[in-house]
From Swiss-Prot:
PANTHER family: TSC22 DOMAIN FAMILY PROTEIN 1. GO terms for cellular component: cytoplasm; cytosol; mitochondrion; nucleus; plasma membrane. Keywords: Cytoplasm, Mitochondrion, Nucleus, Repressor, Transcription, Transcription regulation. It holds the Pfam family TSC22. Its main location: cytoplasm. The keyword Glycoprotein does not apply. It comes from Bathyergus suillus. It is found in: Cytoplasm; Nucleus; Mitochondrion. PROSITE patterns: TSC22. Forms homodimers. Forms a heterodimer with TSC22D4/THG1. Interacts with histone H1-2. Interacts with GNL3. GO terms for biological process: negative regulation of apoptotic process; negative regulation of hematopoietic stem cell proliferation; positive regulation of apoptotic process; positive regulation of cell population proliferation; positive regulation of programmed cell death; positive regulation of transforming growth factor beta receptor signaling pathway; regulation of transcription by RNA polymerase II. This is TSC22 domain family protein 1.
Length: 144
């Protein structure tokens, strides 16, 4: 709730600063040293109002572009979240299937590997205690 209150105040402060800058800039262009003296003149006051209106229009345009960009980004992030949820669900299903198909020895071996931090063996099937087969020598062809 506090964030909602701060944003309009910050926006109003920004508008005030832009107006003050535009008045200072206008007075420097017109060659006056005191902006308040220039504001008393009705023609200059009208130009200041016109500048203020242009500033507000520009700020509204920036705000609408930012809101559009934020909405687009939110949609992209929602889609990514949906894809990640689907992938997570698929991986959980695969994990459950592997748990049901694995033997108790394989599960125990896997738990031991997790506790020691060693990577799972990929060169041999889990549960096998045989050392990996020696690679075939060149020129002998594939062996079964």
């Amino acid at each position: 709730m506090k964030a909602q209150w701060c944003r309009p105040v910050a926006m109003d402060l920004g508008v005030y600063q832009l107006r003050h800058f535009s008045i200072s800039f206008l007075s420097s262009l017109l060659g006056t040293e005191n902006a308040s003296v220039r504001l008393d003149n009705s023609s200059s006051g009208a130009s200041v109002v016109a500048i203020d209106n242009k500033i507000e229009q520009a700020m509204d345009l920036v705000k609408s572009h930012l809101m559009y960009a934020v909405r687009e980004e939110v949609e992209v992030l929602k889609e990514q979240i949906k894809e990640l949820i689907e992938k997570n669900s698929q991986l959980e299903q695969e994990n459950n299937l592997l748990k049901t198909l694995a033997s108790p020895e394989q599960l125990a071996q896997f738990q031991a590997q997790l506790q020691t931090g060693s990577p799972p063996a990929t060169t041999q099937p889990q549960g096998s205690t045989q050392p990996p087969a020696q690679p075939a020598s060149q020129g002998s062809g594939p062996t079964a």
